[in-house]
């Protein structure tokens, strides 16, 4: 009986990380990102914002004005955008279409993309409103 209780506890504990990862993953256009890719980009953006520096010779992260009016989980700005990549963390060069958005306090607000947007605007990636 104790063995079954222990087995149930172990099964629940090992299932929890997968559920957390699924919440942080996103899809921007047809490109999917894992939770760890989103977190890595958000952490890099946070480090740059806190140190007042940018990635490589780029302007990222830079302030995002939210002209589109995203809700971003009810978080308050200022917001900062930083490129989201499938291969490693952005360190300069072409930023691609996808971005993570963080607050000045380094809270992860959401993910947005130029893919499917008009002009230079943005649309939400999955999980962002």
UniProtKB/Swiss-Prot annotation:
GO terms for cellular component: extracellular region. Residues 1-15 form the signal peptide. The active site is at 62, 81 (proton acceptor), 114 (proton donor). Its EC number is 4.6.1.24. It comes from the Eukaryota. Keywords: Disulfide bond, Endonuclease, Hydrolase, Lyase, Nuclease, Secreted, Signal. Pfam families: Ribonuclease. Disulfide bonds join 28-125, 46-106. GO terms for molecular function: lyase activity; ribonuclease T1 activity; RNA binding; RNA endonuclease activity. It catalyses: [RNA] containing guanosine + H2O = an [RNA fragment]-3'-guanosine-3'-phosphate + a 5'-hydroxy-ribonucleotide-3'-[RNA fragment]. InterPro entries: N1-like (IPR000026), Ribonuclease/ribotoxin (IPR016191), Ribonuclease_N1/T1 (IPR051386), RNase_U2 (IPR048269). The keyword Signal applies. It is found in: Secreted. Its main location: secreted. PANTHER family: EXTRACELLULAR GUANYL-SPECIFIC RIBONUCLEASE RNTA (AFU_ORTHOLOGUE AFUA_4G03230). Belongs to the ribonuclease N1/T1 family. This is Extracellular guanyl-specific ribonuclease ARB_00194. It comes from Arthroderma benhamiae (strain ATCC MYA-4681 / CBS 112371).
